[in-house]
Amino acid sequence: MKKLTSAQVRRMFLEFFQEKGHAVEPSASLIPVDDPSLLWINSGVATLKKYFDGRIVPENPRICIVPENPRICNAQKSIRTNDIENVGKTARHHTFFEMLGNFSIGDYFKREAIHWAWEFLTSDKWIGFDPERLSVTVHPEDEEAYNIWRNEIGLPEERIIRLEGNFWDIGEGPSGPNTEIFYDRGEAFGNDPNDPELYPGGENDRYLEVWNLVFSQFNHNPDGTYTPLPKKNIDTGMGLERMCSILQDVPTNFETDLFLPIIRATEQIAGERYGEDPDKDVAFKVIADHIRAVTFAIGDGALPSNEGRGYVLRRLLRRAVRYAKHIGIDRPFMYELVPVVGEIMHDYYPEVKEKADFIARVIRTEEERFHETLHEGLAILAEVIEKAKEQGSDVIPGEEAFRLYDTYGFPIELTEEYAAEAGMTVDHAGFEREMERQRERARAARQDVDSMQVQGGVLGDIKDESRFVGYDELVAASTVIAIVKDGRLVEEVKAGEEAQIIVDVTPFYAESGGQIADQGVFESETGTAVVKDVQKAPNGQHLHAIIVERGTVKKGSRYTARVDEAKRMRIVKNHTATHLLHQALKDVLGRHVNQAGSLVAPDRLRFDFTHFGQVKPEELERIEAIVNEQIWKSLPVDIFYKPLEEAKAMGAMALFGEKYGDIVRVVKVGDYSLELCGGCHVPNTSAIGLFKIVSESGIGAGTRRIEAVTGEAAYRFMSEQLAILQEAAQKLKTSPKELNARLDGLFAELKELERENESLAARLAHMEAEHLTRQVKDVNGVPVLAAKVQANDMNQLRAMADDLKQKLGTAVIVLASAQGGKVQLIAAVTDDLVKKGFHAGKLVKEVASRCGGGGGGRPDLAQAGGKDPSKVGEALGYVETWVKSVS
C-alpha cells in the first residue's frame, strides 16, 4: 500500500477513470443551481441529476463508447449538517467532505464497476491495497454482484457478506442494490470475538467502508412495486477523507493532511496541544471541520444570515467559537485559519486562495458580531432565567427563546446550552411554533407562484421551436404555434381574454439575467393583443403573456410582433450601465465584489453585490464618476460568441447561478468591461448619456444594494434634486451656493439655545427638588420620597434624583413623570440604605409593573418605563408598602 497525500489520491482517482473513458465533471458549487430540493450539494451524484433524469445529455462524444450514454467521474465538494452534533466526537463525521465518484448513464453496469473498483484499489499502479484486507457486502438477492465478486474477482465466500441494508432507495424513482467495499485496519482497531458488530458493515472501527457502488436498475413506482429500468445506471462514492486516513495510516480522518495543518495552526492560537486531553480534542476537531465548510461555502457565494444556508454558516461559525472557549480562545480567530485551508486545498480548488481575503473578512465580521451578540444575549438570557425561576419554573418559554433568536441573533442551541447549565430546559416545541408563524408570515408576503410554473405540465409537452430575433429586430412576422389558457391548450382567445402564447419567431426578450421582459403588441387585421410579460417556457421557448384587445388570436395565424421601442431603449441603457457599475465596484471596493442580484427595468437599475462594511460616500462618488467617464468615452459595445473556457480565460465575468452552455455570449464594453451576458445592450456607451446613483443601502449580512438611473431619468432626477435645493435655499433666505454656510450658522444658534435650555431646566429641577424635600415621609425609620414630577426626559429625572440624594443624605426615592401616554420612572437609594438591603433595581421593577411596564438596574440607581399614566398614583403608593416589607 502506498502512502499518498490527499491531492495525490484525488488526482489518481480521476486519472484512473479517464483511462476508462470517463469525462471529468468539474466540482460544482456547493450552492445548488436549479435544484430547490437541496440546501447544499450533499453528494457526488447531486450535481449530476440533470444527466440521470434525461434533462441534459452530457457532451462527451470524443471519448465515450456510447456518446448519448456517457461515463462521468468527479471529485465533488459537499456539505451535510444533519449529524452536526456528532462532528468532533467521532472519527469520521464531517460537515464538509469530498466524494470521489464514477458514474454511468445507461452504459456499463455491475461487471465493469466492480472490476474497475477492484483494479483501482489493489493494483500496484494505483492504490495497491493488500487484497487480503478487503471484504465486501452485497444485497441478499443480488446474485449477479455476488457471482462477480466470488467467481470473477475471486473473493472467498467468508469475505462476501449479504446484508438486507444493501439497497439504495429514496422513495419514488430510480433505486437498486449496492455493494460496499471494506478495508480491514487490523486487530488494533477491534479484536473481541464476542462483539456482535465486529464484521464488515457492522458498527465498529476495524472494518472501514471505502467505496459504495450503487446499481440503479429498478424504478420504485408510486404503488410500491419495482420495475426494471430500460437504462441501468452506476453511481459510486468514495470518501476522500476516509481513504486518506487508511493510506496515511492514522487513527481518524482528523490526523490526515486534510485536517492536521488546521489543528496545528489552532494549537498556535490556543497555546494548547492536540492529543493530550480528549475533551479539548473535540474542540480542535470541531474547529478544523467547521472552518473547511465555512471557507468553501463563502467562497461559493453563501453569506451568514438568519435563514436558509446563511443560518447554517452562522451556526457552524458560532459552534466553533463556542468550542474554542474550551481551549482558551476568547477572541475572533477563525478567519486566521482561512489561508491554511486554502493552502491544503489549492491543488484542486485554487479559487479558495484567490478569494481568501474576502472569505477571511466575512468570517472576521461574523465572529466579531457573535462576540457582541454573546455579551448582549447572555444579559437578556440571565433576566429570562431569573424571571422563570421567580415564577417557580425550570423551563424557558419558547416565545422567549425565539425572541432571543429573532431579535438578538442568539442561536437556540446556545440558549439550550446555557439553560442546561442553570438546571433548566427550553420549550423547544414553543420555539418551533414561533418559528413556523414567522415562516407563515414570510410565505404570505411572497408573490403567487409564477403562472409558467403552475402550467409547467402543459408547457412541458410543447416541443416546437421558437426563435428569438430581438437582438437585431424589434418587429417580426410571427405565427402562433401554441395558446395556453387556464392551464389548457386552446385554439383561440377572444377580446378581453388573457392567455399565454408561443410563436415561431419573436422579437420580445424573455425576462432573464435581471433584465425584465419586453412589452408591445401582436397585431393583424383579425385581432390585436397586448404583450404584458414574457418568460422562458420549460423547453426554452419564449412564452408571451397577452390580453386580447380586439378581435381574436388564433393558433396558426400570422401576426406582426412589435416591441415597445421606447421602453426597450431605456432598458438597454440601464443594462449596459449595470455592466459598467459592476466593474467600477470591483475597481473601487475590491475584487471580492460579486453580483448578488439585479433588476434592469425601463425606469431604473438595481444592483445587489457582496461587500462587508459600509460603502463610504467618497467611494460612492468615485464609482459614479468612473461609470460616467466610461459613458463619455463613447466606448463601443461589442458582442461575440466564444467557447466557455476561452471566454473565462479572456477574463470574462461569469455570474454565479447562471447556466452557461459550451458556447457563450460575451459582451465587451471597450477595454473596460467583459461579461458573459444574454441581455440587450446599447451599441455605444455614449447612448446612455448620464448615470446617477439614487441610493445605496445594506439589504442583508454582507450584501449591499445600489439603485441608479440613466439618460432622461437621470436628468429628471438631478433636476428634481436641484429644485429641492433651490426651495430650501429660498426658505432660508440665501442662495444654493451659500446654503451650507447658512445651515452651519443655524445649527450653531440651535446648539446655544439647547445649552441655555439645559441650564434653565437644571435650575428648575433644583428648585423642584427643594420643594420635594418637604414631602419626605418616615416609613419604619426610613426616609421615603415617592412623587410625580415634571420632567422632559430620563436625564432630567436622573439629575433630580441625584440632587435629592445629596440634599436628603439618607432616603429611598422614586420619581415619576408622564408624557405622551408614557411613564418614566427613576429609583434611587442612598449608600447607607443599600447596605441594609434596599435595592433600587428591585423597587423600580415592582413600581413599573403596576403601571404596565418594566425595568431594573443597580442597587443605588435604576430606571424603568410604563404604558399607563392613569396608574402612576397607585404605583407610587406601593413604594411605602415595599419599604415596609424590606425594613
Curated annotation (Swiss-Prot):
Comment on bound cofactor: Binds 1 zinc ion per subunit.
Documented EC number(s): 6.1.1.7
Compartment(s): Cytoplasm
Domain topic, free-text comment: Consists of three domains; the N-terminal catalytic domain, the editing domain and the C-terminal C-Ala domain. The editing domain removes incorrectly charged amino acids, while the C-Ala domain, along with tRNA(Ala), serves as a bridge to cooperatively bring together the editing and aminoacylation centers thus stimulating deacylation of misacylated tRNAs.
Taxonomic placement: Bacteria, Bacillati, Bacillota, Bacilli, Bacillales
A Pfam family it matches: tRNA-synt_2c
Gene Ontology BP terms: alanyl-tRNA aminoacylation
GO MF annotation terms: alanine-tRNA ligase activity; aminoacyl-tRNA deacylase activity; ATP binding; catalytic activity, acting on a protein; transferase activity; tRNA binding; zinc ion binding
Function: Catalyzes the attachment of alanine to tRNA(Ala) in a two-step reaction: alanine is first activated by ATP to form Ala-AMP and then transferred to the acceptor end of tRNA(Ala). Also edits incorrectly charged Ser-tRNA(Ala) and Gly-tRNA(Ala) via its editing domain.
Top EC category: ligase
Record protein name field: Alanine--tRNA ligase
Family that this chain belongs to: Belongs to the class-II aminoacyl-tRNA synthetase family.
Cofactor: Zn(2+)
Binding residues annotated for Zn(2+), in chain numbering: 575, 579, 677, 681
Example of a GO cellular component annotation carried by this entry: cytosol
Keyword Protein biosynthesis: yes
Presence of keyword Repeat: no
Xref: InterPro entries: aa-tRNA-synth_II/BPL/LPL (IPR045864), Ala-tRNA-lgiase_IIc (IPR002318), Ala-tRNA-ligase_IIc_anticod-bd (IPR018162), Ala-tRNA-synth_IIc_core (IPR018165), Ala-tRNA-synth_IIc_N (IPR018164), Ala-tRNA_ligase (IPR050058), Ala_tRNA_ligase_euk/bac (IPR023033), DHHA1_dom (IPR003156)
Signal sequence annotation: none
Record keywords: Aminoacyl-tRNA synthetase, ATP-binding, Cytoplasm, Ligase, Metal-binding, Nucleotide-binding, Protein biosynthesis, RNA-binding, tRNA-binding, Zinc
Catalytic activity: tRNA(Ala) + L-alanine + ATP = L-alanyl-tRNA(Ala) + AMP + diphosphate
Native source organism of the sequence: Geobacillus kaustophilus (strain HTA426)
